Design a protein with these regions (language model features):
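S-adenosyl-L-methionine-dependent methyltransferase catalytic module, highlighting the catalytic core
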Residues: 88, 123-127, 131, 137, ...
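Beta-hairpin (beta-strand-turn-beta-strand) motif
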Residues: 75, 118, 147-149
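Short, surface-exposed alpha-helical recognition segments that flank or form part
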Residues: 46, 120, 214
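Redox-cofactor binding/interface segments in oxidoreductases and associated redox assembly factors
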Residues: 71, 115, 144
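Short, charge-rich binding segments
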Residues: 105-106, 133-135
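A short beta-strand submotif of the Rossmann-like class I SAM-dependent methyltransferase core
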Residues: 112-118
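Conserved N-terminal segment of class I S-adenosyl-L-methionine
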Residues: 1-112, 126, 219-222, 229-232
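Conserved short-loop catalytic and cofactor-binding motifs
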Residues: 103, 116, 154-155
Length: 232
């Protein structure tokens, strides 16, 4: 990419100032029914806080998206609850046995593919996303979230993180257009995470009015919705 292309991508995808306050005070947990896993108790408490913004963005960004074939790498991803019903066929691609570094080209490509909290555990993220790209239809979507800064976990299979711009460039270079780019982080979260070697939740971060700030220069996690090129 040329320097101009990098700056153009930055200007097209970087969240605007108003983005950083839109979920400062969290709404009630979305949905009605109790489900398993992350969404079991319909509460924001007890979970790594950046995922709350990620879920809210995901719901907003995908509200008008539907299709035929949904693929995903984790059955516990909370985002699945808010999109699975809009797809007729679902394909689970777990690791093991499947490795995104060696993902073959499938006969039945995806209209939407989700692989959250995975890129930091891939030794060659570009290869993995290029393989995913080969398995997404033109005009299909991919969504992923990834830490920018994090405590060591799943060592030694933990290789790094991504800035929002790094995430945008990764997808731009693998035949995707970046539709939306989100991020969250603040200094309080960073300090608590490294001091306790754990992931702070909503209760640990909220102020007396229930607010949690999102500081643009203290990004801790980011996420992207990207669309495969070749659509009209």
């Amino acid at each position: 990419m040329t320097e101009k292309e990098i700056y153009d991508l930055y200007n097209q995808t970087t969240p605007r100032p108003e983005y950083f306050t839109k979920w400062e005070k969290l709404p009630p947990f979305p949905g009605q029914k109790e489900t398993g896993g992350w969404n079991k108790n319909r509460q924001w408490d007890g979970h790594d806080f950046p995922r709350t913004w990620c879920i809210l963005d995901f719901i907003e960004w995908t509200k008008d998206i539907s299709g035929e074939h949904l693929g995903f790498t984790c059955q516990e991803d909370p985002e699945l609850e808010f999109i699975a019903a809009k797809y007729n066929r679902h394909t689970f691609i777990p690791y093991p046995p499947y490795d995104l570094h060696e993902m073959p080209t499938l006969d039945d490509p995806f209209d939407f593919f989700i692989f959250n909290q995975t890129l930091e555990h891939l030794y060659d993220p570009y290869l993995a996303v290029a393989n995913i790209s080969k398995n997404v239809k033109a005009g299909g979507y991919v969504f992923t979230s990834v830490p920018t800064i994090n405590i060591p976990h799943m060592t030694p299979v933990h290789f790094g993180g991504f800035t929002p711009m790094g995430l945008a460039v990764l997808f731009h270079r693998t035949d995707f257009d970046v539709v939306n780019l989100g991020q969250w982080g603040n200094n309080k979260y960073i300090e608590q995470m490294f001091r306790t070697q754990s992931w702070p939740d909503y209760n640990a971060l909220k102020d007396s009015e229930g607010r949690v700030t999102n500081e643009p220069k203290n990004c801790c996690q980011c996420w992207v919705l990207a669309k495969k090129r070749g659509y009209k």
